Amino acid sequence: MTDAPVSRCGYVAIVGRPNVGKSTLLNHILGQKLAITSRKPQTTRHNMLGIKTEGEIQAVYVDTPGLHKHNDKALNRYMNRSASSALKDVDVVVFVVDRTRWTDEDQLVLEKVQHVKCPILLAVNKADRLEDKSELLPHLNWLAEQLPQAEIVPISALQGQNLDTLEKLVGERLPESEHFYPEDQITDRSSRFLAAELIREKIMRQLGAELPYQITVEIEEFKQDGPILHIHGLILVERDGQKKIIIGDKGERIKRIGQDARKDMETMFDSKVMLNLWVKVKGGWSDDERALRSLGYLD
């Protein structure tokens, strides 16, 4: 008589500096787009759960904002607190670093991770970009000295390379437990939240160097009416100049933002979407704790 498979479940914090590939990693593990991504640092502002259930293993990944050194605004302080809090009461930590580049912000994350008691996996991202893999060795050896308790896994979050190994190692380190979430649930976030994040992603991708970081998105209406899902999104900025940048010449930029966001929404929500966007100036919102609380950034 064979033993029944052991059910395992636990929380897995994905941590690292801004723009190192944490959200891309989560999306590839889940096999679908959940966390927004862009080339801009600090794209992720909230902790978000991504739930992967496969057989007896349920890994509850916590995608975190990148730890950074700027604490000048309430929003920055909130993001750093969110990232730090994710390291508490988790069962596994996946620390994502670049294959060669090491920054002061990587060091900041390292100093946090060195104190955790749970298993650590060091995911060395973008390893696929090196033709000669032996070039990785000096950096891997140095990383092993910094975190001797960690197991090092070279990966490519974008291409999905070696993620099966990473997931296997995560699963082996999760505690024996009943699953926390239904098998078909992939996140703890609401559809309204995901819609707002998709709009913010398109703003960040379209604006490039012009990007005003003092932007956020609030969903004012999210209503299914027959085959059409009606979504009204309010884009908040801090200055009139930022409003003009987002709207663009004759409204062309906000039109493109809406078109791109709508396409992703229709895929995510499996519905035809009617999306309307407005831009409003709300001066100083990113440094106003009352405003941040009303926008869902603070508890």
Curated annotation (Swiss-Prot):
CDD domains assigned: Era, KH-II_Era
Topological category with respect to the lipid bilayer:
Peripheral membrane protein
Q: Where is this region: G3?
A: 63-66
The similarity comment for this entry is:
Belongs to the TRAFAC class TrmE-Era-EngA-EngB-Septin-like GTPase superfamily. Era GTPase family.
Positions of region (G2): 42-46
Q: By its UniProt entry, which PANTHER family does this protein fall under?
A: GTPASE ERA (PTHR42698), GTPASE ERA, MITOCHONDRIAL (PTHR42698:SF1)
One GO molecular-function entry: ribosomal small subunit binding
Region annotated G4 sits at 125-128
The ranges of region (G5) come to 155-157
Q: Where is this region: G1?
A: 16-23
Q: What does this protein do?
A: An essential GTPase that binds both GDP and GTP, with rapid nucleotide exchange. Plays a role in 16S rRNA processing and 30S ribosomal subunit biogenesis and possibly also in cell cycle regulation and energy metabolism.
Q: How does it assemble?
A: Monomer.
Against Gene3D superfamilies, the record matches this protein to: 3.30.300.20, P-loop containing nucleotide triphosphate hydrolases
Q: Which UniProt keywords apply?
A: Cell inner membrane, Cell membrane, Cytoplasm, GTP-binding, Membrane, Nucleotide-binding, Ribosome biogenesis, RNA-binding, rRNA-binding
Location comes to: Cytoplasm; Cell inner membrane
Which intervals hold domain KH type-2?
199-283
- The protein here is known as GTPase Era
Enumerate the spans annotated as Era-type G domain.
8-176
| GO-annotated cellular components | cytosol; plasma membrane
Binding site residues for GTP: 16-23, 63-67, 125-128
Return one Gene Ontology term, BP aspect: ribosomal small subunit assembly
- HAMAP family recorded for this chain? GTPase_Era
